Amino acid sequence: MNLISIPAFQDNYIWLLANRQKHCVIVDPGESAPVLATLAQGQYVPQAILLTHHHNDHVGGVADLRHHFPDIPVYGPQETAKKGATVIVNDGDSLTIAGQNYTIIAVPGHTLGHIAYYSSPYLFCGDTLFSAGCGRLLEGTPEQMYASIQRLAQLPDETLICCAHEYTLSNLKFAHAILPADQDIATYQQQIEQLRSKNLPSLPVKLQFERKINVFLRCNDIDLQRKIGITSPPDSLVSVFCELRSRKDSF
């Protein structure tokens, strides 16, 4: 399989996953022009569009892509029905597209209907789990978002996180501010600074490594809890998540 990240807007990624026959899926096309250019350059033949949620920077290119490819199915959660989705999918559903199997995982939090698509080893998780971070809670509750990222964290170690924004460096700066002595975070921040200075993507990233450097996946870490002022055992790890998310929102 050939995985391509297509830059869009200021920091979005539209994902394209193609097989050897150059049949491909397009994930979260916020705009059409860079997708059409990539399709033409690589002579890819789109088989489906996958939408994770309803925000315009993820669905804005659907109408024009369907103008160019009228028969292409557009999969998405119920909240994308008015944003171009032609096939509504739900938690636990399975899809087979161009010989590749996809499992739908409900991950509410950023939006109430947000979903992820998992096709081993690829995880297209939209704005739920970022490298070294997680999405803002724009519609859902902290309980929902924490449960969602924990659900994704249970996937196999080799899972490749294909999220929709290049937020890695800013997320690592926050993580380093919380855990300045953490060598994994400090070293990775330096690596990503070099990568981004060359305008290269920091994604995808393996889930096994993400568990080390993503503070939102380390809410049970006692040292982290102390660093954010939680000195006694918390009532629930959601409270740790809430404190981290609040601090990140104002970072």
UniProtKB/Swiss-Prot annotation:
SMART domains: Lactamase_B
Keywords: Hydrolase, Metal-binding, Zinc
Cofactor section: Zn(2+)
Annotated positions binding Zn(2+) 1: H53, H55, H110, D127
Domain of life of the organism encoding this protein: Bacteria
Cofactor note: Binds 2 Zn(2+) ions per subunit.
Pathways involved: Secondary metabolite metabolism; methylglyoxal degradation; (R)-lactate from methylglyoxal: step 2/2
Record EC number: 3.1.2.6
Residues at which Zn(2+) 2 binds: D57, H58, D127, H165
InterPro entries cross-referenced by the UniProt entry: Clx_II_MBL, Glyoxalase_II_hydrolase, HAGH_C, Hydroxyacylglutathione_Hdrlase, Metallo-B-lactamas, RibonucZ/Hydroxyglut_hydro
Record has Amino-acid biosynthesis as a keyword: no
SS bonds (residue pairs): none
Catalytic reaction list: an S-(2-hydroxyacyl)glutathione + H2O = a 2-hydroxy carboxylate + glutathione + H(+)
GO MF, one annotated term: hydroxyacylglutathione hydrolase activity
GO biological process, one term: methylglyoxal catabolic process to D-lactate via S-lactoyl-glutathione
Role according to the record: Thiolesterase that catalyzes the hydrolysis of S-D-lactoyl-glutathione to form glutathione and D-lactic acid.
Similarity comment text for this entry: Belongs to the metallo-beta-lactamase superfamily. Glyoxalase II family.
UniProt subunit comment: Monomer.
Protein name (record): Hydroxyacylglutathione hydrolase
